[in-house]
């Protein structure tokens, strides 16, 4: 029996129509369970997944267990990959991330055996190879790009696009380029004391934290056939980052190749005459007070008006270049991605800093004629506080649309959509994933990307 609309009793924010807690809170509970697994429990899950690999395409227990270990703990065990290859199971393709060469060879043999009437299997095997992604796979993809097989005509894209599914690409000369940062940091929301039901779980003690670190050392041996002390140290740091991300929450409660010209002057002119509601004004003041010192800021008002719908533009993401924890991004100056929260669903935005530090904004696509972003959502988003956490698994953002991640791998809702830099024409690199729908009780994800050469930021939006 359907209940009347009410707020989730755990978070006090999301509206639900059933007994229990909202989807976001259930996912957070599941995440907590996985991050607290012992080494023995993880080993048991790995063996169960490998033994019951034929069930993974049912999208039930085995699929969920694999996805949790892979995304939250970064576990990609060769035993699982070998079991999948032996059973000729290729979905999800992440099963084959960094799989050993014998698994790669099995995938290559399968690809060679396929005919042009096996379109779906061709697609699945190419995706699996893209996630395996070693040097020989790169060479194979380049050869298929130069000399396509007859079955290429049956596919929507060539191997140069399939490679992007695995987070890499290659140029006309076959030189490989990574489209992701291997390091990933979580950006967690810090609950304001004035919000309802601000707390989630109680803060964990040192004893439990040590158990997590000890487990991570054991999990490292599952990820590699050669367990080194370096692996243990790196994975222990990963778990410490995941722990700090959770503690932070508890403490504070297809590609387009057309080049576009920057239109800074037009955007500056459009910003004149902006008339904000009282809620929006309050949100701007609150945002300035709450986030000024944070190295990562999300949803900062700008006073600039969208040329399409009239909604206020937001600096959806700001990263401080001088933050030591963000040094792996190699930012030369603060990175700012600005967009309209209404039109980001249909427009790809690009941002570049002018010599005087101003944002030069350009776009690809047409926005909406009407502003659909409510003042309530505007005030809610701009009033949120966020904190930069520690290092987590590179696939942390792939578990669920819960937290913003900087670096790491994106979890595409649809197909991989790496943008083309409007300045140099090169393929941009994934920078951050923002679960926009999670913040406004809606749906969809904003993917922020960067051209390291031109210092241009771009962004696109995907939803189901």
What are these regions (language model features)?
Residues 2-199, 266, 278, 285-464:
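Preference for intrinsically disordered or flexible, low-complexity segments
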């Amino acid at each position: 029996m359907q209940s009347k609309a009410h707020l989730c009793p755990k978070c006090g924010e999301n509206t639900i129509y059933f007994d229990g807690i909202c989807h976001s809170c259930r996912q957070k509970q599941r995440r907590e369970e996985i991050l607290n697994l012992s080494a023995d429990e993880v080993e048991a899950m790995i063996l169960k997944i490998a033994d019951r690999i034929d069930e993974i395409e049912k999208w039930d227990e085995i699929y969920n267990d694999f996805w949790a270990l892979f995304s939250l703990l970064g576990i990609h065990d060769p035993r699982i990959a070998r079991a999948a290859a032996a059973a000729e199971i290729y979905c999800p393709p992440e099963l084959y991330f960094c799989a050993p060469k014998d698994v790669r060879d099995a995938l290559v043999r399968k690809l060679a055996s396929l005919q042009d009437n096996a379109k779906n299997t061709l697609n699945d095997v190419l995706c699996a190879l893209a996630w395996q992604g070693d040097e020989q796979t790169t060479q194979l993809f380049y050869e298929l790009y130069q000399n396509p097989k007859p079955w290429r005509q049956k596919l929507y894209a060539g191997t140069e696009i399939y490679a992007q599914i695995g987070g890499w690409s290659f140029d006309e000369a076959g030189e490989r380029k990574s489209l992701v940062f291997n390091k990933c940091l979580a950006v967690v929301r810090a609950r304001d004391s004035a919000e309802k039901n601000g707390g989630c779980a109680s803060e964990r003690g040192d004893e439990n934290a040590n158990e997590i670190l000890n487990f991570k050392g054991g999990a490292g041996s599952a990820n590699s056939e050669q367990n080194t002390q370096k692996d243990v140290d790196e994975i222990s740091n990963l778990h410490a980052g995941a722990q700090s991300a959770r503690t932070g929450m508890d403490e504070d409660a297809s590609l387009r190749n057309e080049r576009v010209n920057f239109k800074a002057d037009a955007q500056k002119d459009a910003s004149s005459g902006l008339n904000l509601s009282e809620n929006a004004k309050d949100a701007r003041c609150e945002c300035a007070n709450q986030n000024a010192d944070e190295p990562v800021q999300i949803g900062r008002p700008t006073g600039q008006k969208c040329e399409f719908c009239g909604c206020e533009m937001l600096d959806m993401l700001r990263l401080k270049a001088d933050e030591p924890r963000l040094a792996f991004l190699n930012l030369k100056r603060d990175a700012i991605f600005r967009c309209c929260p209404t039109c980001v669903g249909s427009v790809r935005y690009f941002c570049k800093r002018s010599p005087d530090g101003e944002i030069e904004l350009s776009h690809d696509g047409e926005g909406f004629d009407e502003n659909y972003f409510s003042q309530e959502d505007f005030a809610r988003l701009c009033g949120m506080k966020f904190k930069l956490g520690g290092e987590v698994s590179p696939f942390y953002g792939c578990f669920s649309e819960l937290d913003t991640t900087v670096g790491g791998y994106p979890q595409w809702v649809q197909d991989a959509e790496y943008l083309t830099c409007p300045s140099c024409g090169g393929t941009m690199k994934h920078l951050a994933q923002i679960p926009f729908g999670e913040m406004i009780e809606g749906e969809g994800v904003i993917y922020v990307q960067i051209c390291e050469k031109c210092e241009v930021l771009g962004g696109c939006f995907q939803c189901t």
